[in-house]
Regions:
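ATP-dependent small-molecule kinase phosphotransfer cores
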Residues: 3-61
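Small-molecule kinase domains that catalyze NTP-dependent phosphoryl transfer to phosphate-bearing small molecules
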Residues: 21-32, 40-43, 103-147
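Short, amphipathic alpha-helical "lid/cap" segments that border enzyme active or binding sites
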Residues: 50, 146-154
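RNA pseudouridine synthases
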Residues: 56, 68-75
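Conserved nucleotide-binding/hydrolysis micro-motifs of P-loop NTPases
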Residues: 69-70, 86-91, 143-145
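Conserved phosphate-donor/acceptor-positioning beta-strand/loop module used by diverse small-molecule
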Residues: 75-99, 103-113
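C-terminal helical "lid" subdomain and adjoining coupling/linker elements of P-loop NTPases
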Residues: 160-163
């Protein structure tokens, strides 16, 4: 299955974990810290939301989008960590087309989202978002296209005997 933010939140919607996971995804860092203080435990900022995600996914596997998945499952031997990127101009064109916005709005959207992702990843993992050493595969969607990226990922999974 695909586990993106929306799917993970739907899974925990009716549970006590919803507020914590929602805060994690919306970058409200204070909740985990307050939880740790209230519980008088030595809990790091990522223990609570990462524990929830690990509980949801268990040992079944799947695709985890965003959510620091490359860090979260780094100790599992069958984890494949993939980072897809593209040239900024290609990203701008894609955002303009997808959201129906101007070039200036698309540039601002990309800058805002990239900054959020960078800060989010740094806060929860102490790693730099997008650095190649955090991933096994770094694929340039602008060069390969979506279909080319999918083919490379599938070929890689076959080489690793994961499919």
């Amino acid at each position: 299955p695909l586990y993106d933010k929306a799917h993970l939140l739907r899974i925990v919607e009716e549970t006590d974990d919803y507020d914590e996971l929602n805060a994690f995804f919306n970058d409200r860092k204070v909740n985990s810290l307050l939880y740790a203080i209230a519980m008088s435990e030595n809990v790091s900022s990522n223990d609570v939301p990462f524990g929830i995600i690990k509980k949801i996914i268990g040992n079944t596997g799947g695709v985890v989008m965003d959510s620091c998945g490359n860090y979260l499952f780094r100790d599992r031997p069958n984890t494949v960590r993939i980072f897809m990127h593209a040239d900024k101009n290609i990203r701008i064109e894609n955002i303009m087309k997808y959201l129906g916005i101007s070039k200036e709005q698309a540039e601002k959207e990309i800058e805002t989202e990239d900054s959020k992702r960078y800060e989010f990843h740094k806060y929860y993992t102490n790693e730099i978002w997008g650095m190649s050493n955090g991933y096994e595969l770094c694929l340039d969607e602008g060069i390969l296209g979506i279909d080319g990226c999918v083919k490379m990922i599938l070929d890689y999974l076959k080489i690793r005997n994961l499919i």
